[in-house]
Swiss-Prot record:
<protein>
    <recommendedName>
        <fullName>Tripartite terminase subunit 2</fullName>
    </recommendedName>
</protein>
<keyword id="KW-0231">Viral genome packaging</keyword>
<keyword id="KW-1188">Viral release from host cell</keyword>
<keyword id="KW-1048">Host nucleus</keyword>
<dbReference type="Pfam" id="PF03581">
    <property type="entry name" value="Herpes_UL33"/>
</dbReference>
<comment type="subunit">
    <text>Associates with TRM1 and TRM3 to form the tripartite terminase complex.</text>
</comment>
<comment type="function">
    <text>Component of the molecular motor that translocates viral genomic DNA in empty capsid during DNA packaging. Forms a tripartite terminase complex together with TRM1 and TRM3 in the host cytoplasm. Once the complex reaches the host nucleus, it interacts with the capsid portal vertex. This portal forms a ring in which genomic DNA is translocated into the capsid.</text>
</comment>
<dbReference type="GO" id="GO:0042025">
    <property type="term" value="C:host cell nucleus"/>
</dbReference>
<dbReference type="GO" id="GO:0019073">
    <property type="term" value="P:viral DNA genome packaging"/>
</dbReference>
<comment type="similarity">
    <text>Belongs to the herpesviridae TRM2 protein family.</text>
</comment>
<dbReference type="InterPro" id="IPR005208">
    <property type="entry name" value="Herpes_TT2"/>
</dbReference>
Length: 106
């Protein structure tokens, strides 16, 4: 029988109930990427990074190619302005740009 003392959380009570039944549960994580990527991205860290970059690319594509009001829109706009500004300064320092209007930092 479960001990319903007020000190225990619902999760702890559920855990006790499951353990009393004596059953073992197997947790399986199915791959989200095709098998080809297992060769290209051998480590779990590389695969997670690949997925993260993919999600950022999707957010960027939505920002650039459509008037989508998503959570990332403002962040992307700020990062694009910052990146453009940094590139402009680097190119000016190296004397590559003769005219500032090539990169609009506004």
């Amino acid at each position: 029988m479960m001990d319903s003392s007020p000190e225990k959380t619902n999760l702890e009570l559920l855990y006790e109930q499951v353990c009393e039944q004596g059953r073992e549960f197997e947790v399986v994580f199915y791959p989200m990427l095709p098998r080809l990527y297992e060769m290209m991205l051998p480590s779990l860290e590389a695969r997670l990074n690949f997925l993260s970059v993919g999600y950022r690319h999707v957010a960027f594509s939505r920002y650039v190619h459509g008037d989508v009001d998503c959570v990332h829109r403002e962040v992307m706009a700020q990062k694009m302005v910052l990146l453009t500004s940094i590139l402009s300064k680097l190119l000016n320092v190296n004397g590559i740009l003769e005219h500032q209007e090539y990169l609009n930092t506004e």
